[in-house]
């Protein structure tokens, strides 16, 4: 198959001391609010690897639990996961700190501003706009949304992150 041929080719590159991208073994995540909980989906583009994970702070090993279905969270956790073939770790370890606060996993109501689940999924966006944890709008957009906390709550602080990535024409709000 193609993947086995690529693995064989990569072995030749490694034997010659040529560094090649191993990102095909890295894990991508999607965290979405579901009925007051967070659903954490882990995936690798390589179907021939095993995803192993921990939620106790330890580094995953080939003996860690095998990821077979989405994880459901009801509190703050740090998920660590990596891909394995046998006992060998192949990609970088994913370390995913999931934050829990009054808004986590609560519904976001909006009028035409797109899918805003990232506002309450417990994940802070990284410095990479491409991590899919950012909402984006154009300068001409009017953005309104409501976080439904389900009951009256005293809110002392509201934190909303923003990012600047000039190379991708992503800029912080002007106002």
Could you tell me what each predicted segment is?
Residues 168-175:
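Short coil-to-beta strand junction motifs in C2/discoidin
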């Amino acid at each position: 198959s193609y993947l086995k041929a690529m693995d064989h080719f990569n072995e030749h590159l490694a034997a010659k001391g040529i560094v090649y991208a191993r990102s095909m073994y890295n894990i991508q995540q999607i965290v979405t609010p579901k009925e007051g909980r967070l659903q954490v989906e882990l995936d690798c583009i390589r179907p021939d690897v095993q995803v192993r994970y921990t939620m106790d702070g330890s580094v995953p090993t080939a003996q860690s639990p095998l990821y077979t279905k989405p994880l459901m969270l009801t509190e703050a956790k740090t998920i660590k996961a990596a891909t394995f073939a046998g006992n060998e770790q192949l990609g970088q370890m994913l370390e995913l700190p999931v934050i829990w606060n009054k808004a986590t996993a609560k519904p976001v109501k909006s009028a035409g501003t797109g899918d805003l689940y990232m506002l309450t999924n417990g994940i802070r966006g990284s410095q990479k706009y491409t991590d899919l944890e950012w909402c984006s709008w154009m300068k001409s957009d009017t953005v309104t949304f409501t976080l439904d906390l389900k009951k009256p709550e005293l809110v002392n602080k509201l934190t909303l992150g923003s990012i600047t990535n000039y190379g991708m024409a992503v800029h912080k709000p002007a106002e």
